[in-house]
Amino acid sequence: MKIPPISILSHTSESYANAISHELGKGFQHAKLVYQEWFRRGNISGLNPAFKNAQALLQNILSLTDFSFLPISQNLTDGQTGKFLIKTIDDLDIKSVLIPMQAGGTLCISSQIGCQMGCAFCETGRMGLLRNLTTQEILSQLFIAKFRLHFSVRNIVFMGMGEPFDNYDTVMHAFRILTDSHGFGLGNNRITISTSGCLEGIYRLLQETTPLPNLAVSLNAPNDELRNKLMPINKKYPLKELYQAIYDFCKQTSKQVLIAYVLIKEQNDSIEHAKQLTNFLSGLNVKINLIPYNPQSRDRFQSPEQSTLENFTSYLREKGFYTLLRQTKGQKIMAACGQLGNLELKRKKPFILPILKE
């Protein structure tokens, strides 16, 4: 029986080396060298000196390894922000966003195709959930950004398509690969996981024994009545429970939580809303990221006037909250916050992925 290929993008260095040595009966340290070369350079062309006297072993390791990553189907830029699409084997699109910065850029990656959270202001939510991404599909996004598009990745944010905690096990496995010192070697504080308020995910995260990523919470409303309308998850986890989860995360990790708040004209953008927001966030170690609403394919909302954005921001700052008003980028290529959707995929049937050896 033919041995299924071992997908290198689905493994930490330890589990990859274990899988190789299990099949060959040797080669643990040599497999780690292959892993390190692939993740740090994007190819294995520099391995020959390390395998000078073990060419047969190298060929055996390579024959057992699946080095494949998904192809780019589209690569767009508006001069400030980039967006690339990856085509999956079941003919779906994974969307990722590149945000250049002076000291290295931020890569916004997806954890699902579609999303079942149904947030009223989000194009992805209107798709519904088609399926979770695999570890290989999540890691392909970074691999392509770094080695095919030559984008300098300093930070990674799970803020693309999907609710990361709805695909918890895979996202956390990807996190461990991203932070593997023999691989990409990103620091845990360079990675942020954003949630719409999935409390099980927050509390599962607190039970992890390894260093944790940063946490962002997409809040978008300062009271239950409004949040119920904008974010259906609030009906399951109302603000009182969400507050406690944020408080517990801050206390147990000593980390500051990022609060994302999409400002929507005449919905959640008044000074009264700002007052309610400061009252809700009182006592929490947070910073606030204000995001002007971005237009979608079938709009029911609008972005506030610039004066409204500035007044809302000023009020929060006056109350002592560290607040950033995000500059709108990526609208023209549908790469801005809330725009990563494809309603044409909504009617696609689920597809069973072939199993790679893990």
From Swiss-Prot:
Positions that bind S-adenosyl-L-methionine: 162-163, 194, 218-220, 294
SUPFAM superfamilies: Radical SAM enzymes
Protein EC: 2.1.1.192
UniProt xrefs under PROSITE patterns: RADICAL_SAM
Class in the EC hierarchy, top level: transferase
Transcription in keyword set: no
Keyword presence, Membrane: no
GO biological process, one term: tRNA methylation
Top-level taxon of origin: Bacteria
Cystine residue pairs: 108-337
Listed cofactors: [4Fe-4S] cluster
Cofactor binding note: Binds 1 [4Fe-4S] cluster. The cluster is coordinated with 3 cysteines and an exchangeable S-adenosyl-L-methionine.
Residue span(s) of domain Radical SAM core: 101-326
Main location as per UniProt: cytoplasm
Localization, UniProt: Cytoplasm
Catalytic reactions of this protein: adenosine(2503) in 23S rRNA + 2 reduced [2Fe-2S]-[ferredoxin] + 2 S-adenosyl-L-methionine = 2-methyladenosine(2503) in 23S rRNA + 5'-deoxyadenosine + L-methionine + 2 oxidized [2Fe-2S]-[ferredoxin] + S-adenosyl-L-homocysteine; adenosine(37) in tRNA + 2 reduced [2Fe-2S]-[ferredoxin] + 2 S-adenosyl-L-methionine = 2-methyladenosine(37) in tRNA + 5'-deoxyadenosine + L-methionine + 2 oxidized [2Fe-2S]-[ferredoxin] + S-adenosyl-L-homocysteine
Active-site residues, as the UniProt record annotates them: 337
Protein family per UniProt: Belongs to the radical SAM superfamily. RlmN family.
Protein name: Probable dual-specificity RNA methyltransferase RlmN 1
